[in-house]
């Protein structure tokens, strides 16, 4: 074993770089070419930017599901205000009539 120059970075040591360049082949030999090829091709790990998958858009001719909901009249959404007033008046009259205290 030859002594290694201590001033060299570990990734520049002799024998640390493969003699051939990396390629896009996924055969067994190329998957074990170097550590980078093994993680990228062999294990399928890549740390690059991921492309956003676009959502499927509904065709122009089809209606959206929101169009199928019928609109409700405003009186049902807000509630019956007169019924609440009558209930309050009935409660007040009952409390006045009961001499429990």
Swiss-Prot record:
Q: Which domain of life is it from?
A: Viruses
Query: Cysteine-rich: where is this region?
Result: 22-37
Q: Which UniProt keywords apply?
A: Acetylation, Activator, AIDS, Apoptosis, Host cytoplasm, Host nucleus, Host-virus interaction, Inhibition of host innate immune response by virus, Inhibition of host interferon signaling pathway by virus, Interferon antiviral system evasion, Isopeptide bond, Metal-binding, Methylation, Modulation of host chromatin by virus, Modulation of host PP1 activity by virus, Phosphoprotein, RNA-binding, Secreted, Transcription, Transcription regulation, Ubl conjugation, Viral immunoevasion, Zinc
Q: Does the keyword DNA repair apply?
A: no
Q: Where is the composition biased (Basic residues)?
A: 48-58
- Single Gene Ontology BP annotation: positive regulation of viral transcription
Query: Where, in this chain's numbering, is Zn(2+) 2 bound?
Result: 25, 27, 30
Identify the residues that bind Zn(2+) 1. 22, 33-34, 37
Where does this protein reside within or beyond the cell?
A: Host nucleus, Host nucleolus; Host cytoplasm; Secreted
Instruction: List the ranges annotated as motif Nuclear localization signal, RNA-binding (TAR), and protein transduction.
Output: 49-57
Q: Which residues carry this modification: Asymmetric dimethylarginine?
A: 52
GO molecular-function term, one example from the UniProt record: cyclin binding
Which purpose does this protein serve, as stated in its record? Answer: Transcriptional activator that increases RNA Pol II processivity, thereby increasing the level of full-length viral transcripts. Recognizes a hairpin structure at the 5'-LTR of the nascent viral mRNAs referred to as the transactivation responsive RNA element (TAR) and recruits the cyclin T1-CDK9 complex (P-TEFb complex) that will in turn hyperphosphorylate the RNA polymerase II to allow efficient elongation. The CDK9 component of P-TEFb and other Tat-activated kinases hyperphosphorylate the C-terminus of RNA Pol II that becomes stabilized and much more processive. Extracellular circulating Tat can be endocytosed by surrounding uninfected cells via the binding to several surface receptors such as CD26, CXCR4, heparan sulfate proteoglycans (HSPG) or LDLR. Neurons are rarely infected, but they internalize Tat via their LDLR. Through its interaction with nuclear HATs, Tat is potentially able to control the acetylation-dependent cellular gene expression. Modulates the expression of many cellular genes involved in cell survival, proliferation or in coding for cytokines or cytokine receptors. Tat plays a role in T-cell and neurons apoptosis.
Self-association and partners: Interacts with host CCNT1. Associates with the P-TEFb complex composed at least of Tat, P-TEFb (CDK9 and CCNT1), TAR RNA, RNA Pol II. Recruits the HATs CREBBP, TAF1/TFIID, EP300, PCAF and GCN5L2. Interacts with host KAT5/Tip60; this interaction targets the latter to degradation. Interacts with the host deacetylase SIRT1. Interacts with host capping enzyme RNGTT; this interaction stimulates RNGTT. Binds to host KDR, and to the host integrins ITGAV/ITGB3 and ITGA5/ITGB1. Interacts with host KPNB1/importin beta-1 without previous binding to KPNA1/importin alpha-1. Interacts with EIF2AK2.
Q: Which family does it belong to?
A: Belongs to the lentiviruses Tat family.
Its domain description in UniProt is: The cell attachment site mediates the interaction with ITGAV/ITGB3 and ITGA5/ITGB1 integrins, leading to vascular cell migration and invasion. This interaction also provides endothelial cells with the adhesion signal they require to grow in response to mitogens.
Other noteworthy facts: HIV-1 lineages are divided in three main groups, M (for Major), O (for Outlier), and N (for New, or Non-M, Non-O). The vast majority of strains found worldwide belong to the group M. Group O seems to be endemic to and largely confined to Cameroon and neighboring countries in West Central Africa, where these viruses represent a small minority of HIV-1 strains. The group N is represented by a limited number of isolates from Cameroonian persons. The group M is further subdivided in 9 clades or subtypes (A to D, F to H, J and K).
Q: What is this protein called?
A: Protein Tat
Q: Which organism is it from?
A: Human immunodeficiency virus type 1 group N (isolate YBF30) (HIV-1)
Lineage per the UniProt record:
Viruses, Riboviria, Pararnavirae, Artverviricota, Revtraviricetes
- Gene that this polypeptide is encoded by: tat
């Amino acid at each position: 074993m030859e002594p290694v120059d201590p001033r060299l970075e570990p990734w520049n040591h002799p024998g640390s770089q493969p003699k051939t360049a990396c390629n896009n082949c996924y055969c067994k030999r190329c998957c074990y070419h170097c550590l980078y090829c093994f993680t990228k091709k062999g294990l399928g790990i890549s740390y690059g930017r991921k492309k956003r998958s676009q959502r499927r858009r509904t065709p122009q001719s089809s209606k959206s599901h929101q169009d199928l909901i019928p609109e409700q009249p405003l009186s049902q959404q807000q509630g019956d205000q007169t019924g609440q007033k009558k209930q309050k008046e009935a409660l007040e009259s009952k409390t006045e009539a009961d001499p429990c205290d």
